[in-house]
UniProtKB/Swiss-Prot annotation:
GO MF assignments: rRNA binding; structural constituent of ribosome
Protein family membership: Belongs to the universal ribosomal protein uL24 family.
Gene behind the chain: rplX
Superkingdom field: Bacteria
The entry's keywords: Ribonucleoprotein, Ribosomal protein, RNA-binding, rRNA-binding
Annotated function: One of two assembly initiator proteins, it binds directly to the 5'-end of the 23S rRNA, where it nucleates assembly of the 50S subunit.
Gene Ontology biological process terms, A to Z: translation
Any Pfam family hit: ribosomal_L24
InterPro entries: KOW (IPR005824), Rib_uL2_dom2 (IPR014722), Ribosomal_uL24 (IPR003256), Ribosomal_uL24_KOW (IPR041988), Translation_prot_SH3-like_sf (IPR008991)
Protein name as catalogued: Large ribosomal subunit protein uL24
CDD domains: KOW_RPL26
Length: 103
């Protein structure tokens, strides 16, 4: 089970954007990749079509889940998340640094 979900704040651990923070837009659990806002931006050269003009367009490329770390909303630092079970059987994510529940 992945500990990264859509709309989580994450810290980039390696690569050209190391140290930057962003929000997760898309998670692909089968490929082990995520897309983060304004991180790993690449240029795509497109030909003109009937619908849109050609040119150079910038877009976010996927980044491996192993290269990012979840940011705890309480302590505002990069931390790993662990899963705890509640008495009713639901799984929740908990920050390993401060013990706060991550929604």
């Amino acid at each position: 089970m992945l500990n990264i979900k859509k709309k989580d704040k994450v810290l980039i651990l390696s690569g050209k954007d190391r140290g930057k923070k962003g929000e997760v837009i898309y998670v692909s659990p089968d490929k082990g990749k995520v897309i983060v806002t304004k991180i790993n931006v690449v240029k795509r050269h497109t030909n003109p079509t009937r619908k849109d003009l050609g040119g150079i367009h910038k877009k976010e490329a996927p980044i491996a889940i192993s290269k990012i770390m979840l940011i705890c909303p309480k302590c505002s630092r990069g931390s790993r998340a662990k899963f705890d079970k509640l008495s009713d059987g639901k799984k929740i994510r908990v920050c390993r640094r401060c013990g706060e529940v991550i929604v």
